[in-house]
């Protein structure tokens, strides 16, 4: 199968496979480690365990690329905010202080995240040289949603609070961009050779605010990666057909489709970019025949363009690891 970096750089018509959250709760070997490490942030900052977890799906499935085991919220944590992962509730961020946030310095930030960079160094040494090592960040808008605590329900935010603080929001986004670029550079220096930007809450933005809060911040990160000659994949989840405008404005090397995007529409409208993912992770709860039928929709639609086989979101904790293995085999055998 194709090397991920080569596909993104050259836009060659070849294929590759990896999955978001491929190192995670669906794997029994991960759950064994997690059961002995209650603090998720501390686990992310354990270089040896982070590297071991990163390589678990590589050892199990021989997947084409590894993605470092970490979390997008490691950045707010390194910038001094309290971050806690609560079972069955997810991440809770508290005690955001704008003055403290703006007074952070690059040296302290890097020092706090040195264990992440060490994990990347360890993983790069242990990973076959033909396999890519993906690092990642959350986009500024998505991080801001968590940092300000404006998400009221699973897919809703208090947008009036955002609108009432536009000046403060702009300041936070700009400062986040600065530290995200630093985090990206440090990860690249440690050995990562592909970057993915997760804008997980882009779909909560009204269309009229996508340019300022989604397109421009993502574009700045992409431009930074371009200067380092590192390919970058963007994932603006939930923006529906605004994917087309995003692609034109941001110009990423790769674009991860979410499960609401029709593959035929994507092929017709998303030009000069390698496509990735698309299939609903819940598909893996179905029978093998149904899984293969769904996978075929994407493999057939993208058979003559650069395509990275992945999902439209991360693998879910309830996923059967054996089904993941059979899906990878189906993909590799697909003609």
Give the residues covered by each predicted segment.
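Short, basic, glycine/proline-bearing loop/turn elements
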Residues: 32-44, 98-109, 248
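Intrinsic-disorder/low-complexity, polar/charged segments
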Residues: 39, 46, 95-100, 154-155, ...
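A gly/proline- and charged-residue-enriched helix-loop-helix capping module
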Residues: 88-126
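Active-site loop segments of alpha/beta catalytic cores
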Residues: 112-335
């Amino acid at each position: 199968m194709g090397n991920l970096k080569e596909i993104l750089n050259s836009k060659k018509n070849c294929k590759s496979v990896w999955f978001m959250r491929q190192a995670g709760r669906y794997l029994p070997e991960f759950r064994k480690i997690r059961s002995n490490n209650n603090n998720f942030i501390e686990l992310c900052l354990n270089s040896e365990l982070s590297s071991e977890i990163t390589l678990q799906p590589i050892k199990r499935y021989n997947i084409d690329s590894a993605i470092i085991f970490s979390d997008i919220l490691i950045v707010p944590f390194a910038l001094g905010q309290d971050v806690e992962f609560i079972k069955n509730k997810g991440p809770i961020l508290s005690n955001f202080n704008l003055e403290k946030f703006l007074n952070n310095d690059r040296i302290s930030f890097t020092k706090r995240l040195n264990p992440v960079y060490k994990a990347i160094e360890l993983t790069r040494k242990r990973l076959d040289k033909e396999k890519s090592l993906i690092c990642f960040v959350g986009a500024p808008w998505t991080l801001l949603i968590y940092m300000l605590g404006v998400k009221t329900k699973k897919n809703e935010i208090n947008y009036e609070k955002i609108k009432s603080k536009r000046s403060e929001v702009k300041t936070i986004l700009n400062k986040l961009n600065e530290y995200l670029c630093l985090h990206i550079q440090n990860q690249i220096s440690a050995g990562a050779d592909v970057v993915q930007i997760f804008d997980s809450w882009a779909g909560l933005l009204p269309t009229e605010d996508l340019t300022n809060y989604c397109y421009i911040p993502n574009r700045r990160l992409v431009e930074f990666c371009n200067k380092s000659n590192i390919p970058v994949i963007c994932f603006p989840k939930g923006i529906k057909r605004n994917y087309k405008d995003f692609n034109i404005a941001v110009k990423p090397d790769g674009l991860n489709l979410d499960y609401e995007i029709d593959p035929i529409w994507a092929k017709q409208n998303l030009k000069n970019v390698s496509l990735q993912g698309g299939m609903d992770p819940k598909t893996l709860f179905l029978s093998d025949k149904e899984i293969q039928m769904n996978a075929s929709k994407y493999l057939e639609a993208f058979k003559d363009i650069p395509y990275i086989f992945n999902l439209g979101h991360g693998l879910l904790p309830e996923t059967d690891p054996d089904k993941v293995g059979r899906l990878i085999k189906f993909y590799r055998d697909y003609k």
